[in-house]
């Protein structure tokens, strides 16, 4: 299961975060607290998160409800957008022709001296392959970032960056579920990929009266 981190101030302002280590804002903390209760009820076996604090803190909220520790994996970090980091997407669309080109770019387009989509997808897929090898049949929560997760999901399903643009963006603290099939089933049914998308961008409303001090 993939979970995007809770909201940050940069999400509200429409700024590209990339690898900037932005904290959750108040709404983001409420989102994390709320989704944690839902995911804990699914009885996950492990939680693995990007080390950036917006993902790490979301994962720790889930872990606190599920009674699990959080493993950190650098491969789950968000795409590196280079010099675009911290800038408003609306400003970049108006003022930076390279940004406009990058939005419709091929998979190997390097964003502002940062990363390509294929580089991001390769590391997300590698994490998923490791998870299958270590936790076969388990329910594993990967907490990370919007671009990284959407692109990684598309690669798992046999698509590419172009296909990923057919998927809507991931909301803060939404979850998506991808199931892994045994190799013999994939071969017998002629599937293109052992991965199946079971749910995408699911979420729950965030209550406005959560009292963290009382644990509710």
Residue ranges and their predicted role:
Residues 79-91, 133-138, 154-216:
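Acidic, low-complexity terminal tails and accessory targeting/binding regions
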Residues 131, 138-146:
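Generic beta-sheet signal
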Residues 6, 146, 202:
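Active-site metal-binding loops of divalent metal-dependent hydrolases
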Residues 33-100:
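Phosphate-coordination/substrate-recognition cap region in phosphate-metabolizing enzymes
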Residues 43-45, 136-140:
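Short coil/turn segments at beta-strand junctions that form active-site/ligand-binding loops
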Residues 7-62, 110-125:
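Loop-to-helix element that buttresses phosphate recognition and phosphoryl-transfer chemistry
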Residues 1, 71-73, 198:
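General small-molecule cofactor/ligand-binding pocket signal
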Residues 1-5, 142:
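Short, hydrophobic/glycine-enriched beta-strand segments
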């Amino acid at each position: 299961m993939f979970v995007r981190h809770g909201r940050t101030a940069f999400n509200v302002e429409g700024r590209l975060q990339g690898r900037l280590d932005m904290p959750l804002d108040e709404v983001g903390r409420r989102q994390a607290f709320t989704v944690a209760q839902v995911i804990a009820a699914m009885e996950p076996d492990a939680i693995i998160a990007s080390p950036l604090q917006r993902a790490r803190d979301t994962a720790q909220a889930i872990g606190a409800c599920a009674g699990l520790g959080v493993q950190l994996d650098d491969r789950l970090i968000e795409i590196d957008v280079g010099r675009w980091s911290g800038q408003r997407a609306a400003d970049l669309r108006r003022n930076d022709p390279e940004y406009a080109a990058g939005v419709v770019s091929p998979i190997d387009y390097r964003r502002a001296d940062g990363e390509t989509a294929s580089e991001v997808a390769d590391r997300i897929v590698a994490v998923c392959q490791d998870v299958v090898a270590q936790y076969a049949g388990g329910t594993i929560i990967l907490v990370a970032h919007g671009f990284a997760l959407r692109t990684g999901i598309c690669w798992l399903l046999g698509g590419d960056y172009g296909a990923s643009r057919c998927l809507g963006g991931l909301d803060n603290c939404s979850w998506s579920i991808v199931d892994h099939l045994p190799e013999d089933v994939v071969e017998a049914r002629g599937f293109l990929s052992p991965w199946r998308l079971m749910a995408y961008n699911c979420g729950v409303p965030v209550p406005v009266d959560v009292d963290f001090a009382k644990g509710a």
